[in-house]
Amino acid sequence: MTDQHAFATEQVQLDPTLSPTTEETTHFGFKTVAKSEKQKMVANVFHSVAGKYDLMNDLLSFGIHRVWKRFTIDCSGVRKGHKVLDLAGGTGDFTAKFSRLVGPSGEVILADINDSMLRVGREKLRNLGVVGNVNYVQANAEALPFPDNTFDCVIISFGLRNVTDKDKALRSMFRVLKPGGRLLVLEFSKPILDPLSKIYNFYSFNILPKIGEVVVNDSESYRYLAESIRMHPAQDVLKQMMIDAGFEQVNYYNLSAGIVALHRGYKF
């Protein structure tokens, strides 16, 4: 945690005072809050941005998120007849793609803890004609409401950093995977090139909130986005967390020089 704080203050020229967390507290961006409050605070962020979430994804990533997602699908091994959990699936980009891959004999469940995001995703997919093999569930990643050994693939995309207890969530994902199934975690991570880190930090803390203010009239939600990325575990730390949760053959791919990383692990 100290290293992350030093990295943020040195590169971004901010001075957040990070208090150590306890069993009752966690981080909401750079703030230390009660665990019982974080879920509500994250919910408010996504209630605010749900309506223009897809537009902001395109604007903030310059459309590159589509390339990251295509690579993730290529690594998924999903095929006809599979059952897929798109966790923290939001507006359903992955659900739409996986629906076609699994076909009528398979199933995709779009799950999100936030009802606003789930509502936007359901409407979007129905307008695209994605029906028949897709179901929707409001669910907390830390306590998934599915039986053991249910899914061939679980994916969580740009959602794990918002989870209060990441270790508990990873164990929950492991439980619902079938033996032989795989977990894919696509998430913002730590750039591996120092010059890129400096540019990325400037963009994240100076430009990104201003775009949020102009497009959705909400700069604070996008300031939280930047802070939550800095507080998310680095690539090797998340890899070890997945191993500790029971996953095997865990590896990761740095995308866009580590701005995003895709972690993959198997349940055997």
Swiss-Prot record:
Superkingdom, taxonomy of origin:
Bacteria
- Describe the function of this protein: Methyltransferase required for the conversion of demethylmenaquinol (DMKH2) to menaquinol (MKH2) and the conversion of 2-polyprenyl-6-methoxy-1,4-benzoquinol (DDMQH2) to 2-polyprenyl-3-methyl-6-methoxy-1,4-benzoquinol (DMQH2).
Q: Which organism does this record belong to?
A: Pasteurella multocida (strain Pm70)
UniProt keywords, alphabetically:
Menaquinone biosynthesis, Methyltransferase, S-adenosyl-L-methionine, Transferase, Ubiquinone biosynthesis
Name of the encoding gene:
ubiE
Q: EC number(s) per UniProt? A: 2.1.1.163, 2.1.1.201
Q: Which family does it belong to?
A: Belongs to the class I-like SAM-binding methyltransferase superfamily. MenG/UbiE family.
Q: Where is the composition biased (Polar residues)?
A: 10-23
Entry protein name: Ubiquinone/menaquinone biosynthesis C-methyltransferase UbiE
Q: Which Gene3D superfamilies match?
A: Vaccinia Virus protein VP39
Keyword Transferase recorded: yes
